[in-house]
Amino acid sequence: MAVVMDCGLNQIECSADTECDMLYSDRGYLDEWSDSVARESAEKGINIASMYTGHGTYSTLGLTHTDRDCRERMLTQWLFPHIDNAAKLKAIAGFYCHAFDDSALQDPRLYAEYKDILYNQMGRIAVYCAERGVMPSLEQMYSPQQYPWRISDAKDLIKGISRRYAPMYITIDTGHQYGQQLFLKPTREEILDAVSEGGKLYVGPEKCARIFEDAKSGEISADQAADEILEINEAYPHMFAERSDSDTWKWLRELGRYSPLVHLQQTDNKASAHKGFSPADNAKGCVTGEKVLRSLYEGYCLPEEEGMPEPLDKIYLTLELFYSIVTSGNDIIKDLKASVGYWRRFVPEDGIPLDELVKNLGVR
């Protein structure tokens, strides 16, 4: 907490995947940890705004595991204790810990089954949170197996869970839009050109990839391959994004008012590297304070959307920066201070209304 205060901040997002992992730690330790954090944060005037867990994102299928017992364990022994910790600290419970197995992506019927499983899991999470006075915030991702990865998915999930169970919100990450542009539905012309040039092209499910390779090897004609691929892909809408799904600013306009946490990272929209906002990284990146604030404001100006929960009256802009294990502590703190300094140019004090922040952009 001393480092956070030295950076000029008094709001913290705790990572549950370092000091208080729910599967590696017993309940006694978790209670001791949360009690000590609550005590020290109160003494120092620090607000624990959110608790976040994403440790399982790339190591387990988690909430949508193919095994029912594994799914239940992830829910009841990972997420529920995580929510309990957040409740003790009066914090938002942020999370992402699931993925669809490739077999589900390759079978539309199986995909629908696992999507239902996910919605049921999310519903149980939403209810558990509501009973404990905790706001849940699911992080949006950027590939077909990581639902929700498209704007339409996020809206469908928020509406479906909020209507049937209890309010559900999402976390928008400013670097989680680069992947969608790699999963666009190919046109006939793109297929023909790629076959002719012997190049690479994302064509959707595995059966289409095999057809594409057969065409490149000359086993079938390019026209036949294009016909078959386009026909098959009609049954696999879950494997394709719209180009606008890679637009960070559209995500913020469409869904920012339902995102209690916005994870900030600098990016060139070619990777989710979680860079900071130093002058060097800003020179290579596309994320700016002005774009973030204007996009959020434009979203609040839109009419309320039927089926969505009430727009939020508070959003935490949260630096989520990653560093190499060989980066020194001093260099990390230096980069953190530079990043905080950059964002303080746009948000000089916490709690300033969004419309005032946007108005101030014109006089900077």
Where are these regions (language model features)?
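N-terminal pre-domain/capping segments
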Residues: 1-88, 123, 130, 217, ...
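Histidine-acidic metal/acid-base catalytic patches
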Residues: 2-8, 148-364
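Conserved beta-strand positions in the central sheet of alpha/beta enzyme cores
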Residues: 11-13, 50, 94-95, 137, ...
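Active-site-proximal loop/turn and secondary-structure-junction residues that shape catalytic pockets
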Residues: 16-20, 54-57, 99-101, 140-144, ...
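Charged helix-capping and loop-helix junction motifs
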Residues: 28-34, 111-115, 119, 151-155, ...
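Catalytic-core regions built around general acid/base machinery
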Residues: 31-44, 118-129, 157, 250-254, ...
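Active-site acidic/histidine proton-transfer and metal-coordination neighborhood
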Residues: 43, 59-172, 179, 335
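A short helix->loop->beta-strand "cap" motif at the edges of active sites that frequently abuts
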Residues: 44-46, 91, 134, 301-303, ...
